[in-house]
Amino acid sequence: MTQAVTLLLAGLVVFVTHALEAITGFGCTVLALPFVTGLFGVKQGVEILTILAWILSLYIVITKVKDIVWHEFTKILIFVLAGLLIGMYLFHHVDSAPLKRILSYFIILAASVQLIQFVFPKVGQMRMPKAVGYILLFLGGIIHGMFSSGGPLIVLYASQSLPEKGNFRATLCLLWVTLNSIIIGSYVLSSSITRPVTTKTLVMLPFLAAGIVFGEWAHQRVKKETFKVLIFSTLLLAGIVMLVA
């Protein structure tokens, strides 16, 4: 596969996944991970997606700041930060092969949870105990520190504490901006953002911009449930393929 084809395929993945996050406020990194890490490698792919997700989330925060629920953001941030530091340590000190296997299991779990909520709506409506919610936030922080994709676990909590669509999207995007700023800072301090990472990130920017434009247009026009069922079905398959490959 030529480099041009690889970049085009990665760009198409970035467009689709970041359009979905522009609609919902969540999902771009975890959806893009199996494909982009397959094309660029685990660590390089994670770094590129972290930067792109930061840009997208910052755009939504700036344009939708009035929708942020600050007390919920603060609560979520405290528990997630505790796990984030552990995840960042693991990312820098664990080999890529074990990381990829952990990532595969995580993707399968996250996709399965989301699909179960669509098949059995009452599961998503059940109120979880506060302690369980806080544990999910902590675990989500660990996953986010490793792969910048702790969203699925954090969303399980936030979907109950932030039931309004606009509040949900804006508050979570502020969380992603905060967490990814810390992670990107660690990349800079460890000199892991190399020239290839910078170049590929720049190439992905037009695809990101197109995803934002389409996602904002679709936010008011397309049922997000239709998008998410198809996307998480694909994600589940991708996680299985990554596990057995």
Predicted feature locations:
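Membrane-interface helix caps of multi-pass small-molecule transporters
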Residues: A19, I23, F35, L39, ...
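Structural signature of hydrophobic alpha-helical transmembrane segments
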Residues: T6-L7, L12, V36-W54, A97-I107, ...
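Transmembrane helix exit motif
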Residues: L58-V65, I102-M128, E216-W217, R221, ...
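Selected transmembrane alpha-helices and immediately adjacent juxtamembrane segments
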Residues: M1-L39, V123-L172
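Hydrophobic residues within alpha-helical transmembrane segments
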Residues: L12, V16, I51-L58, T74, ...
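Selective hydrophobic functional segments
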Residues: E47-S96, S181-K224
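Juxtamembrane helix-boundary/capping and inter-helix hinge elements in multi-pass membrane proteins
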Residues: G38-V42, I62-I68, S159-N167, S191-T194
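Hydrophobic alpha-helical transmembrane segments in multi-pass integral membrane proteins
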Residues: G45, I86-F91, G141-S149, I183-I184, ...
